[in-house]
């Protein structure tokens, strides 16, 4: 029974750490950019877009495809950084235990 009580205590501590990690990730802002900074995106650590800036020189109606590509590239850059921050936060919570690829708990 002592082991069960210890496990319950550990589970409770891990839950508190996960909640703190989620809160930290929600307030973390990561920047992504493309086109030498002509397009920038800001995402939360949970991947929610908060800002998109486009340099006015890219507003060329005859070349909208380049603008679209740069927006996607900037978003992808920021998303990669947000996922890295999330993975790092989870490693801190799990004590370095690597979770299986694709497992995105609790996010």
From Swiss-Prot:
Pfam families (alphabetical): YbaB_DNA_bd (PF02575)
UniProt subunit comment: Homodimer.
Keywords: Cytoplasm, DNA-binding
Reported function: Binds to DNA and alters its conformation. May be involved in regulation of gene expression, nucleoid organization and DNA protection.
HAMAP family: DNA_YbaB_EbfC (MF_00274)
Native species: Gluconobacter oxydans (strain 621H)
Annotated compartments: Cytoplasm, Nucleoid
Gene Ontology cellular-component annotations: bacterial nucleoid; cytosol
Keyword field contains RNA-binding: no
Protein name: Nucleoid-associated protein GOX0603
Similarity section: Belongs to the YbaB/EbfC family.
Record InterPro entries: YbaB-like_sf, YbaB/EbfC
Main localization (coarse): cytoplasm
GO molecular function, one term: DNA binding
Keyword Cell membrane belongs to the record: no
């Amino acid at each position: 029974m002592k082991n069960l009580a210890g496990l319950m205590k550990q589970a409770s501590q891990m839950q508190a750490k996960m909640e703190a990690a989620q809160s930290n990730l929600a307030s973390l802002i990561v920047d992504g950019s493309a086109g030498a900074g002509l397009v920038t995106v800001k995402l939360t650590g949970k991947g929610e877009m908060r800002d998109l800036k486009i340099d006015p020189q890219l507003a060329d109606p005859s070349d909208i495809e380049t603008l679209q590509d740069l927006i996607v590239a900037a978003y992808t850059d920021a998303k990669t950084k947000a996922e890295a921050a999330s993975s790092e936060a989870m490693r801190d919570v799990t004590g370095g235990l690597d979770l299986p690829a694709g497992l995105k708990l609790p996010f």
